[in-house]
A protein has these predicted regions:
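N-terminal polybasic/positive-inside topogenic patches
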Residues: 6-7
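Anion-binding alpha/beta catalytic cores of soluble intermediary-metabolism enzymes, centered on
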Residues: 23-241, 247-348
Length: 348
């Protein structure tokens, strides 16, 4: 099997794999269009314009035919069309399909986040999740959309946590060289330390361990836990969270059979290749994990929302308003999110 170092198969291996199965066994993959003013449609159109996507899955986009046509024209992409359907169950396995769930009167304002684009993003997401809950699609990949679109929920993980009434939902970043999880996610910096608790760290370690065993078939995941303070506290010289919170959480995890190690100072762990000895890294907060991940993996990584009863992935990057409509967005992250969607269900 042609595996990337992350343990996931490459997109083109998935193409080869799926052709060994008949159409009836192929996954129906839902896509949400994300922010209509961002690069979401560009990523989707570029990926769907490759005929091989129908060797991978039956694709169903939840969005707007009018907006899709607008972006296709802006990108000057010829010989591409979407098959409009009323219900995902009616999807043609040999075509790229679209379920129109957004008002055609929506105004596209490239490069700008607007209340209208936020509403359109969450409308498409809710329509896709309803289809997923009804088993009309098997799995879902989301194009980039802003946090404002999830209001009143504070972020994407909170939105999904509330919808599926589950406490522990965590974005797991997956790249070729590393995987990264988080104890806290979108919080003001002043609130981070107060949310670093023994229980919070332990439950995230437990979630990571279960996810890597079930979804990535790693028998005994090695988890590197990052410290919170400079030099991991330097024997409490720069803070006591390592001694009083992080180490007790690691010990509790190890007592329960989880191979958690640390805490490690991020500058030491990421300065060379030491991080490659671990199956996954647990960061204490958003930027602590996101910066090294994007530095090493670029925008080619994908995000799996761990802890859900459904399978949902997305890209690691945002709407990229600064390059919207220019035709230069890299669809690799979306392609890798699709690869992961097609692989993970075999282990569910």
């Amino acid at each position: 099997m042609e595996l990337l170092r992350s343990g996931l198969p490459s997109y083109y291996y998935i193409c080869k794999l799926q052709t060994e199965y008949d159409m009836e066994n192929r996954l129906t993959v839902g896509f949400t269009h994300g922010d209509v003013n961002g690069i979401g449609y560009e990523l989707i159109i570029k990926m769907m314009a490759e005929n091989r996507i129908c060797e991978v899955c039956t694709p169903v986009l939840f969005g707007s035919s009018k907006v899709a046509a607008y972006h296709r024209k802006a990108l000057n992409i010829e010989n591409f069309s979407l098959n409009s359907i009323q219900n995902a169950r009616d999807a043609n396995p040999k075509r790229c399909n679209i379920v129109n769930c957004v008002d055609d009167a929506i105004k596209v304002d490239l490069g700008q986040e607007t209340p209208e684009s936020d509403d359109a993003a969450v409308l498409a997401l809710k329509a896709a999740l309803t289809a997923l809950d009804r088993n009309e699609i098997d799995v879902l990949v989301g194009a980039p959309q802003g946090c404002n679109s999830f209001k009143p929920a504070a972020s994407c993980p909170v939105f999904f946590s509330e919808r599926y009434e589950t406490r522990n939902v965590m974005p797991l970043l997956v790249g070729e060289k590393m995987k990264m999880g988080f104890v806290t996610n979108h919080l003001p910096f002043r609130d981070i330390a107060g949310n670093i608790t023994v229980n919070n760290i332990y439950y995230k370690l437990k979630l990571l361990d279960a996810c890597l065993k079930k979804d990535f078939t790693i028998r005994k995941p090695r988890i590197a836990v990052l410290g919170l303070n400079p030099h991991s506290g330097e024997n409490c010289m720069y803070g006591e969270e390592e001694k009083n919170v992080i180490i007790p959480a690691i010990e509790r995890a190890r007592d329960n059979g989880i191979m958690a190690l640390g805490p490690y100072a991020p500058d030491g762990l990421f300065s060379g290749v030491e991080f490659e000895k671990f199956d996954v890294i647990l960061a204490m907060y958003h930027d602590q994990g996101m910066i090294p991940f994007k530095t090493i993996e670029g925008n080619e990584g994908a995000v799996l929302l761990a802890g859900l009863p459904i399978v949902y992935t997305s890209t690691v990057h945002g709407m990229a308003y600064d390059i919207t409509g220019q035709g230069i967005a890299d669809e690799s992250g979306m392609r890798n999110a699709l690869s992961m969607l097609n692989y993970l269900p075999y282990n569910l």
